[in-house]
Amino acid sequence: MQTFFIAPTDFGVGLTSISLGLVRTLERAGLKVGFFKPIAQPHPGDTGPERSTELVARTHGIKPPVPLSLAHVERMLGDGQLDELLEEIIRLYQQACVGNDVVVVEGMVPTRHASYAARVNLHLAKSLDAEVILVSAPENEVLSELSGRVELQAQLFGGPRDPKVLGVILNKVRTDESMADFATRLREHSPLLRGNDFRLLGCIPYQPELNAPRTRDVAELLGAQVLNAGDYEQRRMSKIIICARTVANTVPLLTSGTLVVTPGDRDDIILAVSLAAINGVPLAGLLLTSDSKPDVRILGLCRGALQAGLPILSVSTGSYDTANQLNSLNREIPVDDRERAEFITDFVASHLDAAWLHQRCGTPRELRLSPAVFRYQLIQRAQQANKRIVLPEGAEPLLVQAAAICQARGIARCVLLAKPEDVDAVARAQGITLPPGLEILDPELIRGRYVEPMVELRKSKNLNAPMAEQQLEDPVVIGTMMLALDEVDGLVSGLVHSTANTIRPALQLIKTAPGSSLVSSVFFMLFPEQVLVYGDCVMNPHPSAAELAEIAQQSAASAQAFGIAPRVAMISYSSDSASDEEVEKVREATRLAQDAAQELLIDGPLQYDAAANPAIARELAPASPVAGRATVFVFPDLNTGNTTHKAVQRSADGVSLGPMLQGLRKPVNDLPRGAQVDDIVHTIALTAIQASVAR
């Protein structure tokens, strides 16, 4: 069992963020990772579960042991019961080890009230026989002083040459140079880091966005009255302005993520903020001070801003005192802020020395495809594919943001179908930086070039030029023609268009792949422990046995293409012993699929619980090669598939990616209803990988 003990050199180094990122890095190596925070250190105002433990549980789907309370630990230390305390901690540590390859243990943070933290950390590291990784955050100090501070902490655990003291991770690095250049300069000034005994295991740059709380968090921490909640669950405060100036001087400051603080009687500022919100600027919110609220007639004029999601809060304190409170807000990650926790986790993981850490841990007992690994590999493979993906709904704000992310990270070469001025306006309003190389094509200017090719493709259906021109008024049809002519590699739509509007042009112009007679779909279900494939939950209402067999083969091929070993369960309400028309259909579909793909591991009919649960499988289907370990679930009809997908997703705390369409000659994918930026990014990545597999 490998154990990494994460020890801070000082207060405020961001220890929890490093723990989140380290667990993610180790998971990406296919390792089964446990986490353990032996001693809870609640922040002022914390009333729920211990923060680090709960955040790791929610972001990684693991269940760490509950930490000991700080009061209990201090009582035992005060009574001279250090040995008994360590025994208690080791018992909890053993729980964290069960079934895992490696355990990350988060040490105590030294505070004004816990000056003994360093001594306790030393005893913990030795008692757990752990390898120590120090975490430090550079202050405004010369590099030699930073090196000296780190070396002093390393001495507490046996010194930098002790084989159990691995190295240091530097967090919140504030510099204009790249992290690679900073690391090189640090090594030049630090003899400690020049050899292989004590390594620099990561440099994480300071990123203000990582500290941006939700507007809801701001309201709760201030005890503010919520006059209009709007989008306060989603919007984040990245900057604050105190309005004691004219409207003309305030307007340039009304940008994405800004919290505007002003007395409630400043009608001019309130109206200016409302106009900015109506024009699409996603402000963090409007905070009214001095316990004064605007006249109801003014609020009536703000109705459009309220409908646009502008949060409005009110506090009794004056603007100066409110500003002081805002500057002293607790910026720790709330345990229910999954979006921010995931962002920090991936950001930290991307700056750690993953190759060395993976090598240090060796080969896992059994490679596993966790959700974190699946998402990571999805992005990596899409980057390698380097495909050109067209987005017909090009001026939609969520799509513009997703396209900018994909372009900047090299996930895909995105093509937005929209007027460039519309995209620019969206980007300005939303605070989106459009990266170089992001293509924006005006449908009005390119529509004419596709009339003749479309007539040729549809001549068997007697399509003429005027009919083609009319259909090409739809940007989805233009995008589909671009795909048909190999100008792009894939298409993603459906944010505002219906599934039918996305799929119909593809069926007419792209058609099904060779060997396919139908188009079906799969969802990738990301559960805490594994990733499963569900098909078909979108396309085929009542498939025949032959169609169900084809869906099974398509779904197995999709699983294989995305790194999931396909073990296909053909789902039915009853086990193999029952006999009626529906069960017989599933049985026949299983036989047809086995005959068509003899290498495929497939079984059915199987009840869902027998396919998914090893204990039930041993009772209901002991001889099945799939029961209890299925990775691909094929449902007998659309009603069953769609209902199961939604119910299981909600009850099992799962996240679904998809639907991903399969069976088309070229990849076209429909976005799920209510898709957010992450959903769109992942759908673009899925499409890029499909395109690379198809080639």
Swiss-Prot record:
Gene3D superfamilies assigned to the protein according to its UniProt record, in alphabetical order: 3.40.50.10950, HprK N-terminal domain-like, Isocitrate/Isopropylmalate dehydrogenase-like, P-loop containing nucleotide triphosphate hydrolases
Span list, region Phosphate acetyltransferase: 374-695
Keywords, ordered alphabetically: Acyltransferase, Cytoplasm, Transferase
Location of this chain's protein in the cell: Cytoplasm
Main localization category: cytoplasm
MF GO annotations: phosphate acetyltransferase activity
UniProt xrefs under InterPro entries: DRTGG (IPR010766), P-Actrans_bac (IPR016475), P-loop_NTPase (IPR027417), P_AcTrfase (IPR004614), P_AcTrfase_dom1 (IPR042113), P_AcTrfase_dom2 (IPR042112), Phos_Acetyltrans/Butyryltrans (IPR050500), PTA_PTB (IPR002505)
Reaction equation(s) it catalyzes: acetyl-CoA + phosphate = acetyl phosphate + CoA
Record EC number: 2.3.1.8
Pfam families: AAA_26, DRTGG, PTA_PTB
One GO term describing the cellular component: cytoplasm
Quaternary structure annotation from Swiss-Prot or TrEMBL: Homohexamer.
Similarity-based family: In the N-terminal section; belongs to the CobB/CobQ family.
Entry function: Involved in acetate metabolism.
Protein name (record): Phosphate acetyltransferase
Organism: Pseudomonas putida (strain ATCC 47054 / DSM 6125 / CFBP 8728 / NCIMB 11950 / KT2440)
Gene (UniProt): pta
